[in-house]
């Protein structure tokens, strides 16, 4: 009975987007659902509108039907399932800081990025702490995860490659796993993409002639290239080892691209923060609106308020609606 009640709560939060003229077409965006959160900042686990976030900013897959959320001002990592159930994995708003150990007592300072592996490891880009953290499943540990620092110098910003725990970052904003177990992060204060591999940090792009302005998020494309949302240049950049930076979407099409994701068909999705929309970009560069209304922030059925991240997972396009303190989604393939 309780499960059915909670499912109805999540389904009842579905909200239909208004018809919006999309760039390159006239079709209305698909329906957008509010999965969890109510538009009010706070900290609470629960189901649907009972849950509270305070600036949810990044997303990652978490099992077959849920996502992880980095919740900035709650200094925590949360999970959200498709039925709207929210629980805290690690951190808490009253535990800002840097402390490793069991997830139940670990401390984070404004976690911005989160990335997961199939075997359950969770990487966290801690923007204010200037570190990369790792959560590993461990039986008998309070909270179920052990938290360790894998790169960076806690509380100290800078730009230094080398041994991981001696390296320095300046506000890492995302965490993306490579096939070889490396962790990639856009280091926005240094305008570079950094990598942690085998205990060593190096800069893979952004230095020399490969200049970026404000690399905010990264994702893997189907052809193995890394796509970078450069919010400062209003561009999507692409990178492959041994090649110079490329450009995927022409300048003028985007307005502060803050998050990027790739669908199974190769479609790119962008959380275009300043335009208040989520966009889809196909292989030919055609741009369409998936959610939101251009230039209009709001919290009603048709609007977003500074969309920060997107993720394709479990048949949905998930959206971190930053200033509405909620997680939304669009069902794909309809």
Task: Give the ranges of each region predicted by the language model.
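A short loop-to-beta-strand structural motif that recurs across blades of beta-propeller domains
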Residues: 75-78, 85, 130-134, 146, ...
């Amino acid at each position: 009975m309780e499960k059915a009640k909670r499912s109805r709560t999540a389904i009842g939060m579905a909200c239909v987007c208004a018809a919006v003229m999309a760039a390159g077409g006239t079709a209305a965006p698909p329906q957008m659902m509010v999965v969890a959160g109510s538009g009010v900042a706070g900290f609470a686990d629960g189901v649907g509108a009972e849950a509270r976030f305070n600036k949810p900013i990044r997303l990652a897959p978490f099992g077959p039907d849920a996502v992880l959320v980095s919740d900035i001002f709650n200094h925590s990592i949360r999970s959200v399932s498709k039925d709207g159930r929210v629980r805290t994995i690690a951190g808490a708003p009253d535990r800002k800081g840097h402390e490793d150990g069991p997830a139940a007592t670990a401390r984070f300072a404004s976690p911005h990025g989160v990335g997961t592996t199939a075997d359950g490891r969770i990487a966290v880009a801690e923007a204010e702490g200037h570190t990369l953290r790792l959560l590993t499943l461990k039986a008998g540990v309070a909270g179920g995860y052990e938290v360790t620092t894998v790169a960076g110098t806690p509380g100290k910003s800078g730009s230094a490659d080398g041994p991981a725990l001696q390296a320095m970052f300046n506000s890492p904003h995302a965490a993306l796993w490579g096939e070889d177990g490396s962790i990639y992060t856009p280091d926005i204060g240094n305008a570079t993409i950094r990598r942690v591999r085998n205990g060593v940090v190096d800069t893979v792009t952004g230095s020399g002639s490969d200049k970026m302005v404000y690399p905010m998020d990264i994702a893997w494309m189907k052809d193995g290239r890394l796509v970078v949302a450069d919010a400062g240049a209003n561009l999507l950049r692409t990178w492959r080892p041994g090649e110079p930076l490329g450009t995927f979407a022409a300048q003028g099409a985007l307005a502060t691209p803050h998050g990027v994701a790739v669908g199974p068909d190769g479609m790119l999705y962008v959380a275009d923060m300043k335009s208040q929309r989520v966009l889809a970009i196909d292989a030919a560069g055609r741009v369409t609106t998936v959610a939101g209304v251009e230039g209009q922030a709001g919290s009603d059925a048709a609007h977003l308020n500074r969309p920060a991240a997107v993720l394709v997972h479990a048949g949905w396009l998930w959206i971190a609606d930053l200033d509405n303190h909620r997680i939304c989604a669009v069902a794909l393939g309809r």
